[in-house]
Structures are given as C-alpha cells and as structure tokens.
C-alpha cells in the first residue's frame, strides 16, 4: 500500500512540491525560520491544524509580549495548552535573530547533531519536534515520528512506544530502511504515511 502511494505520480508530485517549499525555507530569512520554530513548539501534543491556526493568530504579536500575554492570545485562539506553550514561546522569542544563523551552521554539517542541539537547548522541543523543524527548513534526512507514523510502525508488528531517545532512533532507523527501499528521503516519508492515514498533506 505504501509503495503504491510513493509510486503514485500525482501524490509524489504533491510531496515533491512540499519538499521544494522546505528547500526554499532554507534560503529564507530569520522570520521564516522563527515561524517554523513556533509552529513546531505548538504542534507538540496538538494537531497540526490547531497549531497552525494558533501560530497565525499570535505570530505577529509574540515578540512584543510577555508570557502572560502570550498565554491569553493562545487561549483566545482556541489552543488547549496555552499556559505551558506560552512559557516555551516566551523563552523561544529570546532566540529571535539567532535561530537561522545558529542552527544552519550546525545542520549544514550534521543534521543529527543539529537535532540534538535543538532538543537540548530549546524548551518545548523534543526529537520529533526538532526533526519536524529541521525538515521544514530544508533538511530532509531525519524522520518525523508522530502518532500517525508510530501507528504505522506498530501495524508492522513492531511495538515501539517512543518513550526514550533510544526508541526514537530505533524507529528512525526502521523508517530510513523503508525510505531507502522506496527511493524517497526519510524526511518526506511521513507525508506519504500521513496521507495514507488521513488522505491529506498538511504538515
């Protein structure tokens, strides 16, 4: 089933079109990189659609607000975890102006090292969110393993729960093998799997 999706010319064209957008983001300015960081912080433990809606609601105001004001805006936007994410976003906004320069310098040399740096130094970001962020700014060699992808792996008969870094890397290794077999970059594989389960490409 997954192979047939990857070989589907129309779907593959849509995925490759998204990949071009990611690669263009890599050349974009700090504002775009910061936007993607905000989106990935909001996407954690939330749906992409909810996160995207809230990001658009707060993005042009967040740099001028304190934590409480960010929390109120998130609540107004309908976002569920408004207090927790306000705390993360308030810390993240202090990185504005340094996000692209700092991360690109590392990621251009080693994408896995860049992910480790992000997951270690940016509050509210784990391996999945760091991989998602890096993919969205043009680095396609890391797996984004959300609940849809985890369900796909579990349906293969592999009981991984992603409760540790070790399990994430194990799942990523499996997905990398599948991606290589299908001749697609692992950073795009989740788009095919997400489409298989939801019939949409949004990420």
UniProtKB/Swiss-Prot annotation:
Catalytic activity, as annotated: 2'-deoxyribonucleotide-(2'-deoxyribose 5'-phosphate)-2'-deoxyribonucleotide-DNA = a 3'-end 2'-deoxyribonucleotide-(2,3-dehydro-2,3-deoxyribose 5'-phosphate)-DNA + a 5'-end 5'-phospho-2'-deoxyribonucleoside-DNA + H(+)
Q: Which GO terms describe its molecular function?
A: class I DNA-(apurinic or apyrimidinic site) endonuclease activity; hydrolase activity, hydrolyzing N-glycosyl compounds
- Active site, per annotation: 128, 146
- Which SMART domains does the record cross-reference, listed alphabetically? ENDO3c
User: What GO biological process terms does the UniProt entry carry, in alphabetical order?
Assistant: base-excision repair
Q: Which InterPro entries match?
A: DNA_glyclase/AP_lyase_Ogg (IPR012092), DNA_glycosylase (IPR011257), HhH-GPD_domain (IPR003265), HhH_base_excis_C (IPR023170)
Its domain of life reads: Archaea
Spell out the disulfide connections. Answer: none
Q: What is its EC number?
A: 3.2.2.-, 4.2.99.18
Which residues are marked as site: Important for guanine/8-oxoguanine distinction? 203
Record keywords, A-Z: DNA damage, DNA repair, Glycosidase, Hydrolase, Lyase, Multifunctional enzyme
Asked if the keyword Manganese belongs to this entry, the reply reads no
HAMAP family assigned: Ogg
The record's section on NCBIfam families has: PRK01229.1 (NF002305)
Family indicated by similarity: Belongs to the type-2 OGG1 family.
Tell me the function of this protein.
Catalyzes the excision of an oxidatively damaged form of guanine (7,8-dihydro-8-oxoguanine = 8-oxoG) from DNA. Also cleaves the DNA backbone at apurinic/apyrimidinic sites (AP sites).
Q: What is this protein called?
A: 8-oxoguanine DNA glycosylase/AP lyase
Organism annotation: Sulfolobus acidocaldarius (strain ATCC 33909 / DSM 639 / JCM 8929 / NBRC 15157 / NCIMB 11770)
